[in-house]
Amino acid sequence: MQRLGWRRIGVGLSLWLVLVASAAGQGASPQAGTQPASAVATFAGGCFWCVEADFDKVAGVISTTSGYIGGRSANPTYDEVSRGGTGHAEAVEIVYDPAEVSYQKLLDVFWHNIDPLAKDRQFCDHGDQYRSAIFYHGEEQRSLAEASKAAVEKRFKQPIQTAIVAAGPFYKAEEYHQDYYVKNPIRYKFYRFNCGRDARLEELWGKKD
C-alpha cells in the first residue's frame, strides 16, 4: 500500500509539472521586432529560366520557382501562356530569409537583370507574357518597389515600362522548366547568349563586378 501511495504522488507531481510547462508556453510571446523565418517575392523579367538562375546566386535566397502570374485563367500551361492568350507573365517566385537578404537587395538584383525600357518583351522574347513586372506582397513591398522604380527612372531618359502590381495567384510551371539552367546547362547558355541578354544588360547597367 505504501508503494502505491508514492506512485500516486509521483503521477500527481508529473501532471502538475506538465500543466505548469503548458501554461508557461501559452503565456510566452515572440519578441517584438523579430523577422519571419522566410518571406516571398515575385518578379517577372522575361524568360523565367534566366530570372531563376540570376536569383539562385543571391545569398539568403532559400528557393526559386518558375511559374505564371497575372493572367485570367487558372492553372495555365506553358503552351497556353507562350501563345499569349492568357494574360499571364512568366515569373519567378522567390522564398528568401529576410535576416540574410533584404527585399531592397532583391529589387536591386531584379532591376540589374532586366531591360526596364522594353515594353511587352525582354531581349529576344516578344509578347506580353515576357513583360517585366514586380508583383508585390503587402504594402511594405509595394512602397519599396515604387521607391526603387523612382530611382531607376532618374537613371534613364526613356520611360520605365516595368509594372508594379499586387501579386495574385501564382501557378508553378511544368517540372522541366524548374532549374532549367542546371538540368540543361549547354542549351541554357546557348539560349542566353543568342538572346543577347547579357550584352544588353551590360549596355544598360555596365559590367557586373
Residue spans for each PLM region:
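Small-residue packing motifs within transmembrane alpha-helices
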Residues: 8-10
